[in-house]
């Protein structure tokens, strides 16, 4: 039941549960499968690296809903690495860090995400 509910939340066809993991999956289906694993395994810490990369707007919304469900139900910690702040808009963000060339050059709270949305990354890349 839990698997079925999570697959429904992620807009995944139930037949995917019978398939080999990621075999014949599109890029978006693989991303959803990653979030499905997150919801099923409930790790204390998850690192999501470019989870929104290559996803269309609808898929980003769906994946965000899955991540939000993890935040609400599992109470685990997330490290989300992204170049696009879109996926962060509907999530609870405790801290934000900007990394350039391997160094963290700015730390902030959720308001830093809003600042980046308004002015972009250009000011950080010039350092």
Residue spans for each PLM region:
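Conserved catalytic segment of ABC-fold P-loop ATPases
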Residues: 89-98
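Conserved beta-strand-loop-alpha-helix hinge in the C-terminal portion
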Residues: 99, 103-126
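ABC-family P-loop ATPase nucleotide-binding domains
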Residues: 1-42
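Short alpha-helix of the ABC ATPase nucleotide-binding domain corresponding to the H-loop/switch region
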Residues: 57-64
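Walker B catalytic motif
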Residues: 50-51, 58
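The feature captures the ABC ATPase H-loop/switch
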Residues: 83-87, 101
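Conserved catalytic loops of ABC-family nucleotide-binding domains
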Residues: 66-80, 88-90
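Hydrophobic residue in the Walker B motif beta-strand
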Residues: 46-48
